[in-house]
Amino acid sequence: MACLGPSAQVPELPEKNCGYREVQYWDQRYQGAADSAPYEWFGDFSCFRDLLEPELRPLDRILVLGCGNSALSYEIFLGGFPDVTSVDYSSVVVAAMRARYAHVPTLRWETMDVRALGFPSGSFDVVLEKGTLDALLTGEQDPWTVSSEGVHTVDQVLNEVSRVLVPAGRFISLTSAAPHFRTRHYAQAHYGWSLRHATYGNGFQFHFYLMQKGKELSVAQLAVGAQILSPPRPPTPSCFLQDSDHEDFLSAIQL
């Protein structure tokens, strides 16, 4: 498929962008998910396979955050990486995915909040998220200046990711957020990881971030991370379109 955006018909949207953070919205959205086509934010597995597979090992214990009804976990299994645990805080979609992939016993599905993972420290070799952090940040009014609440929410998730990773474990984030928006979140020394960035997609670029626990951030990356609550402002344009809080933030990436 073309790596342009969601792969299925757009479901009913929340009244406001901040609704993407509410479990009630996702529970309602995923009613009937067991029988519906997978919905893929930022492209399906084939779009970023060449970037992802070199970072995986056949015996890796892999955790997928905010799985939704994406086929990603199953595609990873088919790629030769069988040990995949997927979590979402919508119990509705977790039940649907358990039913859909009941024939694959090494795929596990758990209802869980990504800000408070119920796994022991050092449980996974790889943690992967695709669009989950984007959804948590959709309520932000200004992408250049994330609120202290937004920074705290992302920090909660990333602290948990670092905790459940083994030494030398990898965290992989797939997102629409370019480095000038996302690096400052990932480039924090207390997570104890390094940071690399790549892009993928045809026409519209998406972003692939790789963090490896036990390696260090560069001086330049640490400097960007230090700006987390006071990032540089973008140039003021001579004219602009007024954003609406009713705009479908996630679907707006489609071409």
UniProtKB/Swiss-Prot annotation:
Keywords: Methyltransferase, Phosphoprotein, S-adenosyl-L-methionine, Transferase
Motif residue range(s): Required for methyltransferase activity: 129-134
Annotated positions of the Phosphotyrosine modification: Y39
Organism of this sequence: Bos taurus
Disulfide-bonded cysteines: none
Reactions accelerated catalytically: L-lysyl-[protein] + S-adenosyl-L-methionine = N(6)-methyl-L-lysyl-[protein] + S-adenosyl-L-homocysteine + H(+); N(6)-methyl-L-lysyl-[protein] + S-adenosyl-L-methionine = N(6),N(6)-dimethyl-L-lysyl-[protein] + S-adenosyl-L-homocysteine + H(+); N(6),N(6)-dimethyl-L-lysyl-[protein] + S-adenosyl-L-methionine = N(6),N(6),N(6)-trimethyl-L-lysyl-[protein] + S-adenosyl-L-homocysteine + H(+)
CDD domains named in the record: AdoMet_MTases
Name the record gives this protein: EEF1A lysine methyltransferase 4
Molecular function per GO: methyltransferase activity; protein-lysine N-methyltransferase activity
One Pfam family hit: Methyltransf_11
EC number: 2.1.1.-
Family: Belongs to the methyltransferase superfamily.
Role noted for this protein: Protein-lysine methyltransferase that efficiently catalyzes three successive methylations on 'Lys-36' in eukaryotic translation elongation factor 1 alpha (EEF1A1 or EEF1A2).
Signal peptide start-end: none
Gene Ontology BP terms: methylation
SUPFAM superfamilies according to UniProt: S-adenosyl-L-methionine-dependent methyltransferases
Annotated residues for binding of S-adenosyl-L-methionine: W26, Y30, W41, G66, D88, Y89, D113, V114, K130
